[in-house]
């Protein structure tokens, strides 16, 4: 089976170009199995604001206490995931919404105590995911369940998407409101792994882009052939990436 992981950022979800679903339908008609992973940062922030809770980030990652976790879980599973599945189904693209708990899709562990209820994936149930791909487009939110302590955890959606791509040895398209990796305000078309650390050290890659590229580096070192970071608001962006039309930034082991 040939998979493509497509990570849709929270910013793109509110302004997702309708061609994304059509492009995904086209992939399936060509026996390519797309797997959607989504975040929901803006929606989580809005839900927290409604409860007078201020979001807090460390090194680009959301700090998640118990109250924040409860709101995050409800927002991602009941609101964002459900709405996205409905959107796909309305376009005659049969989709199924999933979190880590469903079909024991993936297992997690706590990331770091300072981040609270933030987890990282440790194993992926490839058999279950492969079977679901033959019937539906899986739409996976970034909520996981820890079988050891019986708690739900928030996972950085990029981290989860990269982990799935590495586990399946599949390419990943990371779609957000960012056109690619910017160096001196210019999108670079290709970023080899060897250049990532120096760009971070020099401050050219900073903020929320740091975990994105480090997770991409880790994914490629563990089996993912390439990572493409591109804008999800452009028409037919998935088709353009698939056809190697040089959109966004392609992160790869070395320059071709």
UniProtKB/Swiss-Prot annotation:
The record marks 7, 212 as: Transition state stabilizer. CDD domains: AAK_NAGK-like. It catalyses: N-acetyl-L-glutamate + ATP = N-acetyl-L-glutamyl 5-phosphate + ADP. SUPFAM superfamilies: Carbamate kinase-like (SSF53633). Its EC number is 2.7.2.8. Pathway: Amino-acid biosynthesis; L-arginine biosynthesis; N(2)-acetyl-L-ornithine from L-glutamate: step 2/4. Substrate binds at residues 40-41, 62, 154. Keywords: Amino-acid biosynthesis, Arginine biosynthesis, ATP-binding, Cytoplasm, Kinase, Nucleotide-binding, Transferase. It holds the Pfam family AA_kinase. Catalyzes the ATP-dependent phosphorylation of N-acetyl-L-glutamate. This is Acetylglutamate kinase.
């Amino acid at each position: 089976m040939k998979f493509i992981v497509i990570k849709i950022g929270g910013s793109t979800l509110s302004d997702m170009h309708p061609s994304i679903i059509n492009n995904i339908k086209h992939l399936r008609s060509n026996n390519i199995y797309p797997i959607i992973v989504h975040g929901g940062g803006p929606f989580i922030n809005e839900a927290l604001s409604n409860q007078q809770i201020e979001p807090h980030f460390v090194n680009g990652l959301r700090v998640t206490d118990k109250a924040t976790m409860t709101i995050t879980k409800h927002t991602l599973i009941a609101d964002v995931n459900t709405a996205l599945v409905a959107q796909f189904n309305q376009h005659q693209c049969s989709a199924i919404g999933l979190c880590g708990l469903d079909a024991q899709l993936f297992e997690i562990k706590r990331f770091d105590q300072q981040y609270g209820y933030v987890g990282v994936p440790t194993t992926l149930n490839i058999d279950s995911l492969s079977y679901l791909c033959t019937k539906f487009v899986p739409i996976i939110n970034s909520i996981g369940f820890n079988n050891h302590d019986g708690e739900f955890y928030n996972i950085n959606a990029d981290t989860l998407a990269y982990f799935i791509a590495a586990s399946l040895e599949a390419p990943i398209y990371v779609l957000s409101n960012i056109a690619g990796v910017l160096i001196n305000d210019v999108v670079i078309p290709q970023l080899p792994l060897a250049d990532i650390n120096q760009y971070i050290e020099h401050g050219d890659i900073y903020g929320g882009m740091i975990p994105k590229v480090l997770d991409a580096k880790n994914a490629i070192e563990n089996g993912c052939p390439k990572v493409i970071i591109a804008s999800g608001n452009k028409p037919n962006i998935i088709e353009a990436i698939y056809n190697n039309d040089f959109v966004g930034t392609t992160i790869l082991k070395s320059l071709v």
